[in-house]
Every structure is written in structure tokens, then in C-alpha cells.
Amino acid sequence: MRILITNDDGINAPGLEVLEGIARDLAGPDGEVWTVAPAFEQSGVSHAISYTHPMMIAKLAPRRYAAEGSPADCVLAALYDVLQGARPDLVLSGVNRGNNSAENVLYSGTVGGALEAALQGLPAIALSQFLGPETEGLADPFEGARTHGARIVRLLLEKGLWDDGDYRLFYNVNFPPKPAAGVRGQRVAAQGFRRDTSFGVEPHMSPSGRRFLWIRGGAQHSPTLPGTDAAVNLDGYISITPMRADLTAHDRLAELEALIG
């Protein structure tokens, strides 16, 4: 099996090392693991692509590259340059430091990398480690993902739905904010919404007298509807959410057509 991995926390992020281990486990001794990840932090870039300027790329080691671009850029760089036309059997993005559940999905570069792979017709999974009070004291905050990651990916490869439509299905996986031994299993869950956690800005003044702003988010442990991704994570379960890039509100098309068509 040939596996391509990327992330949004950058080439030196600890979560990428976790994902490389997961990928090596999945690929086996005869497989290939290729890493093309951002040279710098790219959290919050979503599905951005850098088509207005060139993307520098450097080979760091055999099958390991750093690109000065977003996770989606890295997927494109791998498919159309690094791999020299060879197609990966699977694309994994992560393991993100922090959850990519609920509304975070819309901002996530980790999800954006998987989304781009899906648009390119490839099986893709985004993986993130929810952090919280129970992971703060751990020697390895990623131990949930490290312990259960390969099993979850195998489960999806063996039993998941992998349609090949125009907006191909991909998966968003979040590991709960628990030690590995405290993970209770996995749940298929819809994307939730935290009503009191939208982003805002926090104004400050620099020592030189210049005004600047920090973008801040809300509490990541706020509740979502029961059974949705963040809710099952907080209950100790790994959430598995099937996703597509199609943002159309299909359930409202007929109603809107009747009103204004």
C-alpha cells in the first residue's frame, strides 16, 4: 500500500510523527509512506490553495518533503510532482493538535487536506486529537490517536463507504480528550455546532503604540447536540463523520424553488 500523509501543524509537529507511525503500520514492510507537509504552521487555512504565488518545496529525507503552502497545496504537490505520477492508495491528514469537530471543520487545514485528496478521487481521512484536562498530564497527549489510529483507519478501509461521485466521500475522525485506556470505542456521528464558540477579535496595543488584533475562538468543550461529533468525543468515543465538499442545502432546494423559481 502506498500512503500519502500531510497535516496543517507543519512538518515538525508531533502529531505528524504520530501519523507517520500509523501510516507505517498500515502500509506494512512492503508498502510506502510519503510525507508532504507544510514547512510552516498552517492551522486555520481550511481548503486554501496558493495559486497566486509559487510554492517552494524541499526534500528533507527519502519520501519526506516540506512545502511552503497549505495542506491542500501539499496534496497537489505530492500528486503532480513528488510522486511522479504514481497514485497513493490512501491519503491521511493529521494528526491535528486539537479537535476538528463541529464548526472547527470549516476552518481546519487538516480537513482541507483530506478534502483536496477526495476531490482528486482518492480515499482520504482527516485525523485529530481532541485535547483537554485529562490529556494535559500525559507524557504523550496524542496517545489516544497513537494507540487507536491504525485500527480506526483499517476499520474504515474494510467496512467504510467509499463512493466515487463528483464530490467523493471522505472521513473526519476525532479522538476523544481521554487517555488511550479511557477510549470507550467509536461512534458514527454528524458534524455538530457549538453555539457559543464563534470566532471574534481581541484588540491590543503594541509597545510602539500600534493597534493590533488577535483572533480568538470560544470554549472547545461547550456542548453540542447529543450524538454529534464533539458530544461523542466528550463522552469518551472516537467520532467518525462521513463528509463531502458539496455545501448545497439539498433539503431546502425544492422549498426555495417553490418560493422564487
UniProtKB/Swiss-Prot annotation:
Listed GO MF terms: 3'-nucleotidase activity; 5'-nucleotidase activity; exopolyphosphatase activity; metal ion binding; nucleotide binding
Bound cofactor: record note? Binds 1 divalent metal cation per subunit.
Cytoplasm as a keyword of this entry, yes or no, is yes
On whether Membrane is a keyword of this UniProt record, the answer is no
Signal peptide residue numbers: none
Q: What is its main location?
A: cytoplasm
Which residues does a divalent metal cation bind? D8, D9, S43, N96
Keyword terms, alphabetized? Cytoplasm, Hydrolase, Metal-binding, Nucleotide-binding
The reaction(s) annotated as catalysed by this protein in its Swiss-Prot or TrEMBL entry are: a ribonucleoside 5'-phosphate + H2O = a ribonucleoside + phosphate
Which top-level group of life is the source organism from?
A: Bacteria
Cofactor(s) essential for the protein: a divalent metal cation
Q: What is its EC number?
A: 3.1.3.5
Compartment list: Cytoplasm
Gene Ontology terms, cellular component aspect?
cytoplasm
* InterPro entries according to UniProt: SurE, SurE-like_Pase/nucleotidase, SurE-like_sf
Task: Please report which protein family the annotation says this sequence is part of.
Answer: Belongs to the SurE nucleotidase family.
What PANTHER family has UniProt attached to this entry?
5'-NUCLEOTIDASE SURE (PTHR30457), 5'_3'-NUCLEOTIDASE SURE (PTHR30457:SF12)
Q: Which NCBIfam families match?
A: PRK00346.1-4, PRK13931.1, surE
Q: What does the protein in this record do?
A: Nucleotidase that shows phosphatase activity on nucleoside 5'-monophosphates.
Query: What HAMAP family does UniProt report for this protein, alphabetically?
Result: SurE (MF_00060)
The name of this protein is 5'-nucleotidase SurE
